[in-house]
Amino acid sequence: MYSLVSCAALAGIAEWVCCPGRLNAPLYRALAACPAVHRWDVADNSAAAFFALGRVQATGRPVAVVAGSGNEAAAMLPAAVNAYYGRHPLLIVTVDDAANGGGTGAPGCVEQESLFGIYAPTVQLELPCPVSDLPDLAGQLAEGFPVHLQLRVDADAVMPARDMSTLTVAEPPETPPFRGSLVALSQMLRFHAQEGLVLMIGALEPAEQEPVLWLARTLRVPVVADAASGLREELAASCLHDAEDILCETPPPYVLRVGAVPESPFWPMLEDMPDTQVFSITRSGFSGLTRQSEVIEGEPEQIMKALGDVPHVGDALRLLPASRQASGRTEELLLESQESAPALVRAFSMHASLAECVCLGSPTASALWNRYAQWQVPTLYLRSLHTMGSQGVLSTFLGLSAGAESAFCLVGDLAVLRDMAAPAILPQLPPGRRVIAVLANNGAEQALDDTEDDPELERLLCQPQEFRLADLAALWGAACYPIHTEADFEVLDTADDDALIFLEILPE
């Protein structure tokens, strides 16, 4: 086990999230003997995996999570899915009895090979083993995808103790070179973009924001920026309001997407716009479309350097004047409906704008934030946590905000119910104020636009939950405040700097 910890340290793994398990004790003894490694203890396997995913996103380093026995490891599959599509290097470790493994039906023994399918390929390792047999974790995690390490151990063996006090953790693996040809993109920018180009910016890592901001300011084209890009407020003057309406009325000949797959409603509409050519610069490598498009996979900074100088293109289709009119209509709406969900999200965004970390934990939360949140103060670090589903949102938020003095999260009520074990992690976190605003959306009713004229379908699809958020908050030792108007947010002005606070947003 000591050689395994050393192997992981060479891959840049400085944090281990550990679940209790029948065969995990030797590994945990080795981790306890290594002061260079930080260990988190989480009882729930799903919460542990999502917390580890949050730590990967917060640190930019690979993080290991150790599963419990038997079928408990399967609870980590949703986190593996999120890590795969977000391209985050998560190492999932499962421990199996070499003498009585999966396939026997013995208590606590399940087939672990290929447990996570394509989302985390399995690497098998039988311990103890020679150093030469240890896997190249650094190389396998360098691509940025999750990996499943299946350990097979002798349950009766006694592991000798070793001195781990001098072990150091290496820097994370270097990012591989970008993949894809820049020829078509370069020709479009230099010779055709003046016909009409829109820049769509999805979620970005903090290190990606500066080169993408340079690109947007150089091109000077209309922008559709997700809140999770971190550039929505910086590029406010170029951002399109009600983008889906404006761009459907005046389809652009070219769209350049940078970052993750955009959350804008206009993005899926591109499936039915074959005359619009789509180019993507993305770290994940996923096109986000079933139709043909040009994808360049890699870090934006590498790609911008290879692309060289780009021209000033401007608003060739005159989209921004229509956007300013839409912005005016939005402001009128907020003034007329000050107790509506959009108005309360606007007020919440003003309080959250100065936090070190802001997270959005449901599609409804992201849609409201992207359209109605404040535009004046740049949000330093904003994440969407629900891209592949709303499971594990609170655990991921706590992992992301573990080192933050102030962190805010906006989620739906179902996301809270699906991650009720998350706050058990709180006693291990450094001091800080964590504010979780919960949108009361009647069991996802507000997210189902297609049920407005079909009450029976609404009855079948909606899942209203009879629960009181205040009771859950009390279970976790948190304060809970109902929010009906903008003035109700004043409770945050007097709240402790080290507290977990729930805000139950109850719009008209």
Which residues make up each language-model segment?
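Thiamine diphosphate
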Residues: 83, 93, 98-113, 119, ...
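Structural signature of the thiamine diphosphate
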Residues: 4, 12-15, 59-67, 73, ...
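Structural motif
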Residues: 19-21, 68, 127-129, 150-153, ...
